[in-house]
């Protein structure tokens, strides 16, 4: 018998649905979650496990993963006091939103953006001020600044390069926004390693209201390890840390991060490959009249077709899983797929040419 728990739960849940991935997470060729096509080499995994097996598994990890935070701070050339590590960047998003939002507070979110931003704002009963992007899916910087100030919003969230549009803000535009509003500005740089634009990291010392979010899931190929970071000034970071759940990052994640940062040439090589393949795929697809391609600054590509749902299912029937992002604002009949291995990319091209050529 069904029970009605609505009166006992957070009323915001009535406006939400559980996170899901259309088509699932298993496929012969999986290109739907913006993952790296490259796993860590076995020799590096062995090196990591050789260290990890000597850790005390019966003891809690540190409240905050200080070894991982110092390793990443040293890698970036910044003070460890400006860095906080989390169990994936999604956990850090939860932490930052908890620190910045509550019922009735306003948050500015360009649309379309990463869906978790809206979900978290709704959960916290905040008021969302959405700012549509231009029709070509580029940011409307003037509108972001104007709406933030008009609405007196205290929090702005920017994803650059943006998921799902794959386009970036120029550093000068980030500077304009951060300096032009009286709000905390979160810049989510999950895909920054693939961008033609400079990171906002250079602005951290200049603007005390700037927070940068990073993930190790994309370029560093550590999606299964769940490693994310917030970077900001120590005073603001100490406040953001207050709602963070303790002990969420395990020692294995810390050790893995340290070893991958020591062998960063593996990341450089993978990023170089992805950029080459991105350019190749964009060039191939731009020659197909029935496919519209958008510029990409990430490890994934956005295309528009006449019937995205049909193409999505046709590719799925061929064992190729992409993402149907048609439900996002301004992205009707759009599909998203990350750069895979060369053989996977070739097969995707072949199927798209056959369907739309």
UniProtKB/Swiss-Prot annotation:
<dbReference type="InterPro" id="IPR005861">
    <property type="entry name" value="HisP_aminotrans"/>
</dbReference>
<protein>
    <recommendedName>
        <fullName>Histidinol-phosphate aminotransferase</fullName>
        <ecNumber>2.6.1.9</ecNumber>
    </recommendedName>
</protein>
<comment type="subunit">
    <text>Homodimer.</text>
</comment>
<keyword id="KW-0368">Histidine biosynthesis</keyword>
<keyword id="KW-0028">Amino-acid biosynthesis</keyword>
<keyword id="KW-0032">Aminotransferase</keyword>
<keyword id="KW-0808">Transferase</keyword>
<dbReference type="InterPro" id="IPR050106">
    <property type="entry name" value="HistidinolP_aminotransfase"/>
</dbReference>
<dbReference type="InterPro" id="IPR015422">
    <property type="entry name" value="PyrdxlP-dep_Trfase_small"/>
</dbReference>
<dbReference type="InterPro" id="IPR015424">
    <property type="entry name" value="PyrdxlP-dep_Trfase"/>
</dbReference>
<dbReference type="InterPro" id="IPR004839">
    <property type="entry name" value="Aminotransferase_I/II_large"/>
</dbReference>
<feature type="modified residue" description="N6-(pyridoxal phosphate)lysine">
    <location>
        <position position="218"/>
    </location>
</feature>
<dbReference type="GO" id="GO:0004400">
    <property type="term" value="F:histidinol-phosphate transaminase activity"/>
</dbReference>
<dbReference type="GO" id="GO:0000105">
    <property type="term" value="P:L-histidine biosynthetic process"/>
</dbReference>
<comment type="pathway">
    <text>Amino-acid biosynthesis; L-histidine biosynthesis; L-histidine from 5-phospho-alpha-D-ribose 1-diphosphate: step 7/9.</text>
</comment>
<dbReference type="InterPro" id="IPR001917">
    <property type="entry name" value="Aminotrans_II_pyridoxalP_BS"/>
</dbReference>
<dbReference type="InterPro" id="IPR015421">
    <property type="entry name" value="PyrdxlP-dep_Trfase_major"/>
</dbReference>
<dbReference type="Pfam" id="PF00155">
    <property type="entry name" value="Aminotran_1_2"/>
</dbReference>
<keyword id="KW-0663">Pyridoxal phosphate</keyword>
<dbReference type="GO" id="GO:0030170">
    <property type="term" value="F:pyridoxal phosphate binding"/>
</dbReference>
<comment type="similarity">
    <text>Belongs to the class-II pyridoxal-phosphate-dependent aminotransferase family. Histidinol-phosphate aminotransferase subfamily.</text>
</comment>
